[in-house]
Regions:
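First exposed extracellular module after export/assembly in secreted or surface-exposed proteins
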Residues: 4, 36-243
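Bacterial Sec-dependent N-terminal signal peptides
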Residues: 1-48
Length: 243
C-alpha cells in the first residue's frame, strides 16, 4: 500500500507514532480537576522523525527500567520498536488483534538536558495482558498508552466517523475511565497499536483520506475536546491508497 504525503520514514522503520502516558501537562492541556471527568487525556506530543518528544522526565513513566538508564527531558529522542506474536489472535471490531511480546525503547538525550553530554541506550518496556488492534502492516502503526492511578481503571476506545462536509474519515481515540477497564500497576503505561491501513479495509475506495483525532479533555460544559494530529509537514489529512 502506498502512503502519500504522510511522513518521512527514513529514520523509523517500526511504529511511527508513539504516545505514552498522562501527566505531560506541557503537551496535553487539561484542567486540574480532570480526574472528575469520565474521559482522561492520554497523549503527548511526538515527532515522526525520532519517535516521541517527552515533556517531562521519562522516569515518571516506567519506574526503575528508565530511571536506571537515564533521565530524559524535553527534546530527547525516543524510538520504540516491538515484536508481534502472530499466534495470539482474537476477533475484534478492528478486524484483527495481535499480542505484542515486548517493546524496546531506544533513546538519545540532548546535550545539557541531563547536565552533561548526550547519551544513548535502550531498555525493555514491560508489557502484560495487552492487545494490538488492527490488521498490522510492517511499518504503519499508531502506538499509544496511558498511565493511570493505581486505584482506577481505564480502557481505550477508538471510533470511526466521517466528516459530512469533506468526506474525510476520522479515527477518534479516547481514554475512558470506569470499573471495567484495566487497572494500572504502579506507574506503568500500556502501549497499543493500530494500522492506518485499516481505513482502506473500511472503505471500497482505492484512495482514502482521513484524520486522527485524540481526546485531550473536556470543557467546562462537559463537551469532549479533541486535537487533530498534524504531521511534521503540517498536514492534518493523511492519504493512503491501494497498490
Amino acid at each position: 500500500m502506498k502512503i502519500l504525503n504522510v511522513l518521512n520514514m527514513k529514520r523509523i522503520v517500526f511504529p511511527f507514532l508513539v504516545m505514552l502516558m498522562l501527566g505531560m501537562s506541557g503537551c496535553v492541556k487539561h484542567s486540574d480537576n480532570v480526574q472528575n471527568y469520565p474521559y482522561i487525556p492520554a497523549f503527548v506530543d511526538f515527532s515522526f522523525e525520532y519517535g516521541i518528544i517527552l515533556n517531562t522526565a521519562i522516569g515518571s513513566i516506567v519506574s526503575s527500567e528508565i530511571q536506571n538508564a537515564t533521565d530524559l527531558w524535553t527534546g530527547d529522542a525516543v524510538l520504540v520498536t516491538f515484536t508481534v506474536n502472530y499466534d495470539q489472535q482474537a476477533s475484534t471490531e478492528y478486524l484483527i488483534a495481535y499480542g505484542v511480546d515486548y517493546v524496546k525503547v531506544g533513546y538519545t538525550t540532548a546535550e545539557g538536558t541531563t547536565g552533561g553530554e548526550s547519551t544513548s541506550g535502550s531498555f525493555d518496556f514491560p508489557i502484560e495482558d495487552m492487545n494490538v488492534f488492527g490488521l498490522l502492516d510492517k511499518t504503519l502503526f499508531l502506538i499509544f498508552g496511558h498511565k493511570a492511578p493505581e486505584d482506577q481503571n481505564f480502557y481505550y476506545e477508538m471510533t470511526f466517523d466521517r466528516d459530512v462536509t469533506t468526506g474525510t474519515q476520522m479515527l477518534k481515540i479516547r481514554a475512558r475511565k470506569n470499573g471495567e477497564g484495566t487497572k494500572a500497576e504502579k506507574n506503568i503505561g500500556y502501549p497499543y497499536a493500530f494500522s492506518i491501513n485499516n481505513f482502506l479495509y473500511h472503505s471500497s475506495e482505492n484512495t482514502v483520506e482521513f484524520t486522527i483525532q485524540y481526546m485531550t479533555g473536556v470543557d467546562e460544559d462537559g463537551n469532549e475536546e479533541f486535537k487533530t494530529f498534524v504531521d511534521e509537514s503540517g498536514n492534518s489529512v493523511i492519504k493512503i491508497s491501494r497498490e
